[in-house]
Amino acid sequence: MLLTFFMDGVKYDMMQEHMPFLASLNTRPIISEFGYSCACHATMYTGRYIDEHDTWFIWQKGENSPYKWIDKVPLLKYMNILPLKLLLGKVTNKVYTKSGKITAYSGVPCLVNLPLKYWSKFELADKVMWNNPTWKAEKTKSLFNILRENNIEHEIIALHNRTQADDAFIESQRITEERLRELDYIYYFIGYTDNMMHSHGEEKESAEYLRKVDNFIKSEYERVKKVSDKRVEIIAFSDHGHITLDTSENALININDYFKYQGKNVNNYINLIESNFARFWFRNDTERQEVEEVLHKLEHKGLGFIINKDIKDKYHLNVDESRHGEMIFYLDAPREFTNTIWGFGHSVKSGHGYLPTHPKHFGIFCSTREIKEEVEKVSLLDILPTTLNALKLNEQIKQLELRGKELWQ
């Protein structure tokens, strides 16, 4: 029997320091994707690269925006008042999630600092939850569909949006002893670890919560072992680590300041500004030239770089530029953008989405079984084949031609 514990945003050195049970297992750092959590989850559950599963960011340019209705209300898209935008975001999210039209983990986020005139140009990359049978079904098979197709008795704990601190702890108790005896696999989703890291960084609040999670994993392992007549194994992992941000005023980059230096405004161009990625789409060559000129200024200051073909090849980011971004600037750690689609960033102490090679960005992989000696670092691509191997679904590994490797001895 396999117990998989996913913890969002737990970094390797904090696991070693504050999670003694997990640290006592076989452990390796895990290398993240060059993107945010939505890209990581898609890679974890499909065993495919970003340019294969095609989820890089939550938002992409497209025709199926949940905000299309804004354009139908006369003059509404020109009313860029923050309280109004927050209200429109809240109402739209409620309508789409309550109706079941969108069940994705993200829901329908508010595009806080993006002018309303652009909202209708963007759609969600994922519209349903990762364990929905239709998720990525047109492209490949996901972990959850493989479980269903092979009649693996399983339970999924706390995999839903608006994750709260104790959800996994509480929801795990609904599995009775009788049900535990039937099961081959349990997937536990612990998403609040990422919230704690964003809010508190490496401070004591995060450390205390990690210890609580560690105790929960240990107690669940012991509870299942007492009941199940099968050999019980653990795989515990995160999608990425966290990097402590420089929260001084100089480190919070308002990209529009650089456009102003050139006599421009960032919102003259179709854009999505996130924590450390700025994406642009162009209506003509002049716009492209003007944006590129500004982004080169940021490059010359050593703040980051425009993502070029070499970077796309290295990190498997050869996606459709018309949807994901025709020009993308990456802002390097420990800085972040302010005035983004997510808000203003002033209260965020720790972040992710940075180059996967940053040591503080390494996530965790912990296992009761020994990991192959030659494996120094784990890739998110390895999660699916290792899980299927543990469930004795090796034929599926061969058929799917997964990109990762099996990690166990």
Label every PLM stretch briefly.
Residues 3-7, 12, 21, 212-254, ...:
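Metal-dependent active-site segment of extracytoplasmic phospho-/sulfohydrolases and closely related
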Residues 12-15, 52-54, 163-166, 195-198, ...:
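Short catalytic/ligand-binding loop motif for oxyanion handling, primarily in non-cytosolic enzymes
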Residues 13-61:
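Short, structured active-site-proximal loop/turn typified by the sulfatase FGly-forming signature C/S-X-P-X-R
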Residues 48-203, 212, 272, 290, ...:
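His/Asp/Glu-rich, glycine-adjacent segments
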Residues 242-283:
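Acidic/histidine-rich catalytic neighborhood
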Residues 270-390, 404:
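Active-site neighborhoods of enzymes that stabilize oxyanions during catalysis
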